[in-house]
C-alpha cells in the first residue's frame, strides 16, 4: 500500500489519490485528474523560492516507509540549492518498489522514482522488484550498444553492489546513485512546466490541463531547442525508435556496424543517444 513520509496537506489522502491510483484518466466522461487546487505545483506553495526540505517532503509518496526516510536524509545532507529549487516544478515525488524505469508524468505533474536508487541496506533492497527495465531488450537485434558514464576526477562514480554480497551503501554514495536521476527527471518537469509559465497557472485545471496547451502548440523549451538546433541524422532517429520506443529493427538497421553509428553521431548535434 502507498504511504507517505511526511504530510501537512489539508487532505493527506489526496496526495496518494492524485498521483498513485491506477485508474487516473484524462479523457472522456471519466476524467478524474486532480485540479491544482487539490494538488498544486510546489512552485505555487513557495512562490518560486527555494523549497525547504519539509515542503518537499510534504509531497512525497512512498510504497515503503524507509524510502521516505532515506530520501529525506538525502535531501537534508546531500542536496544542493539548485536541486531543491528544481522541485518547484513538480506536484509530487513518488518512490516505489515497483517503479521501473523512473519517469516524469505530465498528467499528474509528478516524478516517479525507482527505489533501487535509494536503498542503503540489504533488507531495504530485498523489497524492490528485480524485473529489468522493459526497454532493456529493445536493442537485441542491433549490432552496437550506446555507452555512457558519469565521472568525478575522471573516475566512474558508480560502484558495483551485487545482490548476493548483502553489503550496505553509505548515505553519501546516494548523491552519485540518485543525484543524476533527480536532475534528469526534474529537468523533464521544468521542460513541461517552466518557471516562466508557473505564475499564470489555472488552479481549476489539472497539471495536464495546464501543460497540454503548451505541449500541443510545441511551446516547451525542448521544442524551442529542437527548432533552433535540429538534429540532422535520420538513421539515428530511426534507431532511437527501436532502442527507446520498441519499434522493430529493419534489415538496414540490423546491419549497421558500431562505426556506422559513430559516424552518424559524430556529425550531428546531440550530446548523447538519450537525454
What does each model-identified segment do?
Residues 1, 190, 209, 213, ...:
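Generic low-polarity alpha-helical segments
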Residues 1-103, 197, 202, 275:
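N-terminal low-structure segments adjacent to metalloprotease catalytic domains
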